Amino acid sequence: LPVEVVAEFDTWRKIRDHEGAEGWVHQSMLSGRRTVIVTVAVRLLRSEPSESAAPMARLEPGVIGWLESCRGGWCEVEVAGIDGWLRRVDVWGVRADEAVED
């Protein structure tokens, strides 16, 4: 699951998930690769960062994808081996003002 690190102490990280639950984990339990989770109604994974782009997959709430990059209001993600674009507001795991480059 995607988590946000909200505090650090030595080798421990306090994390928060998309539902707001918090806890401490050892840093070795965390991956350096970012993930996001679809948090709203069914969304279409699109071929380009545009509402008019061809749909590549239909994603249900709770689907997790690998975060590749974000450009403006869109994020490029990989879900089950399919690369595509989702609107940033439709996922949890990346902040609205955060720059993400691949």
Question: Where would I find each of the regions flagged by the language model?
Answer:
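Boundary regions of SH3-family modules and the immediately adjacent low-complexity/disordered segments
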Residues: 2-58, 64-66, 70, 75-102
